[in-house]
């Protein structure tokens, strides 16, 4: 049956900011869904709070509302737009939870909005642990022995009855939040308390642990007529016990017998039919490796991280088809976009192997607990495709950008066998390297299988890789013959890995390959195992059979993507890459994307003319360049990942469009940059590059503390810190020089001024600044973690003039063609430059949307030779809009045990939301609500622990908050200070005093907000850390910068009815 004619206007709910457990995959699926609906003539209204996405571009939906994802704001959009339908399954867990809340609160019924796609009843049956378990029992699908609990004591009683270990799974949460495996009652109490608080319905499933069983997933599609297919089945290399988002995953599954495969396929179809899914659904099973016993773990009745992976692994666009099914189409009525011949009811066939490896953020968090479990901690992932497992796996390892090209890891060489055993039994993000080291020392595969639950098939494959590494280490380059090299390449070894083992350069291996004509061939991802001719230009490299790439004679450009999502390099760079491709297409240039992230829009096969799903390493990128012979390569939009290739491409005489390697070096090399600033008469905070701890101490003495220290050539403020005394500086420098001895450490005088930022475009003669952005928090908080305001609110015309002057001088002197990002500090009336990035930055999507200047489009045209004066947006500073927009950071620290919450110069946020208002206070209110930072006033209490440097600044803010009804709880010093100023305050004991003390108050959630300004270098930092962690783990707001608290107080003082007076704004207008 074709299109349901009653559907005219659909509201799509996005997934909001990127957090751990809900990343770029929902930008990809949401964008696909909106485009599928529009292609059918449906009017699409989108609400999503995330400005960094392609999904929130004005071209993707007919109406776009960048508003907080709360019932109040969604109701305002419904009232204004009057959609007839709601599509909920494209916004991840956030979208599902909101759809259920909209239904249960009566809003959908009130405005006569129907849910299309999977129904609310089916969502509840899939998400509510009790309803799901009951249904499985009804249809005869096995589930693990379990109990639904809503309080602590019932959970303890059940665990005692069935025995430990038990798995805790909260209902309606994201990425396993609040869950875990408890080995005893003490652990259960901690996990259960967290799970009950984080579940939106206060419900947790406790189940007997089947840790060590295989974890298998099926991605299934079903239409409203009951047609049902499995798109892809995937096997987690890590067994049950590690969240699938933190597992290495292989598709198709490699170790299932045909009987096991068919058994689980039948079960997944049985489940999806019984729940009544209409669209896509992910089903997770645990499978006993020794018998045919299996159990259903859970389902996701929506598109998910796994469905994005399955879409990219097979070329089958799940989200697009789910949207079409929601409109009434059957699977047998929708054409396969890849073949244009077959229909969506044909199950995809894979004649290659896909490996997904998670990307974890532990490089950002010194001292983090890295142990993996049922709670997801990865920020992103890479995907690699190969003709065999070894090839895909080794491609995956080098795609992670952790400096590893093989399984040989120096760190594990010093470990004893019992230490290695511990490491593989309590897995962390580096377990695979510990495993390889055990195999290198001939530890028996059977024993490793027993202690880890990892299938012998995978262990044997890893053993083969390790043995080849050892063989290479014992050889010389003269021993490497054509056959051996060819075999190593077929199994995924990179030139660099081979060269490192043979102690020669990658160039030596490249020359041998050239002499022997060992070149990669590129195969097409075609959904049908070569059965039908495919039209998708989507390729992966192998060293196998013939090449399927047709190289054209058109003028072509290669755009290098940004790789996996990580803190400091997120979805913003994918946004820039996609817009670059779109701009090139308009210029009739053939576009080629190279990227390895399965979650993103850039790796959708119909975005570019050709997509190469490959690692972003020198060798892999060079192979594609040699194949395609492009006019040039664009690195500017792929973040630091792409920029790192600049020098290599220069050595190979490959043309980079826009900014060159020398220009990048001028901006990033401290001495060259200082010389440039001096020549241009531009100020910067005093400082220099130092090469030893002693030199650092001398420089700090000359500058005076506090000083800002950081490595050179980093992104996201990685490794950056403000140090207040010699002890802290020695600790920092000692660690920094251990990590990197080849580059200097930069040391600057720290100025606590106003931070200002611009993204500008230069054509070599003129510049265009779309907008001047001002940071709410003073310098010292990383720009990615600051609340950013546009138009700037406190920057005078004189300073704006200087910003224009300095930006123009720098862009022209460096020779920028395209994008440049500059960060300034205004301090005591003077303007200083603190950083110049000769590339697109993470603020590009935000400033593009709020200034309505298509920045990437203009920058791309400029790179291809256009002049700013001819492009219709003028030069110098673009006119400011009437509305005020604020970008508010969103953090995922709750998901990462034992990591610091406090704001500082190293970036910690994973995502962002936008607040748009008629004035700054309205915009801030929306931004804080959208980021879940606004105090709920449920209890009206603020816990304040303020260090001595901040007490004078804190008092006027506290007075204002007291005026609007907040009460304070504080330790002795802060309490005394508040009372002296006539502010009502309740005293609380410190951590080391008897209970109930300050930590108990936080743990019992007796406050709405914790304000804690950290002290450095003494014991109270430890107290502060414990308080901040306890608050974050209980979902309480934590503020560590008084500028943020000042802004909240200003919003609270504002006399507007927060429900009635706030408008919602369509940004397409």
UniProtKB/Swiss-Prot annotation:
Binding residues annotated for Mn(2+) 2, in chain numbering: 298, 300
Positions bound to Mg(2+) 3: 823, 835
Binding site for Mg(2+) 2: 298, 300
Cofactor: Mg(2+); Mn(2+)
ATP-grasp domain location: 133-327, 674-864
Region (Carboxyphosphate synthetic domain): 1-401
Binding annotation for Mg(2+) 4: 835, 837
Binding locations of Mn(2+) 4: 835, 837
Every MGS-like domain range: 932-1069
CDD domains xref list: MGS_CPS_II
Catalysed reaction, written as an equation: hydrogencarbonate + L-glutamine + 2 ATP + H2O = carbamoyl phosphate + L-glutamate + 2 ADP + phosphate + 2 H(+)
Gene3D superfamilies assigned: 3.40.50.20, ATP-grasp fold, A domain, ATP-grasp fold, B domain, Carbamoyl-phosphate synthetase, large subunit oligomerisation domain, Methylglyoxal synthase-like domain
Region feature (Carbamoyl phosphate synthetic domain): 550-932
Amino-acid positions noted as binding ATP 1 in the UniProt annotation, renumbered to this chain: 129, 169, 175-176, 208, 210, 215, 241-243, 284, 298
Record's keyword terms, sorted: Amino-acid biosynthesis, Arginine biosynthesis, ATP-binding, Ligase, Magnesium, Manganese, Metal-binding, Nucleotide-binding, Pyrimidine biosynthesis, Repeat
Pfam families (UniProt xref): CPSase_L_D2 (PF02786), CPSase_L_D3 (PF02787), MGS (PF02142)
Pathway: Amino-acid biosynthesis; L-arginine biosynthesis; carbamoyl phosphate from bicarbonate: step 1/1; Pyrimidine metabolism; UMP biosynthesis via de novo pathway; (S)-dihydroorotate from bicarbonate: step 1/3
Gene Ontology annotations for the cellular component aspect, listed alphabetically: cytoplasm
Function noted in UniProt: Large subunit of the glutamine-dependent carbamoyl phosphate synthetase (CPSase). CPSase catalyzes the formation of carbamoyl phosphate from the ammonia moiety of glutamine, carbonate, and phosphate donated by ATP, constituting the first step of 2 biosynthetic pathways, one leading to arginine and/or urea and the other to pyrimidine nucleotides.
PANTHER family membership: CARBAMOYL-PHOSPHATE SYNTHASE [AMMONIA], MITOCHONDRIAL, CARBAMOYLTRANSFERASE FAMILY MEMBER
Family: Belongs to the CarB family.
The protein's name: Carbamoyl phosphate synthase large chain
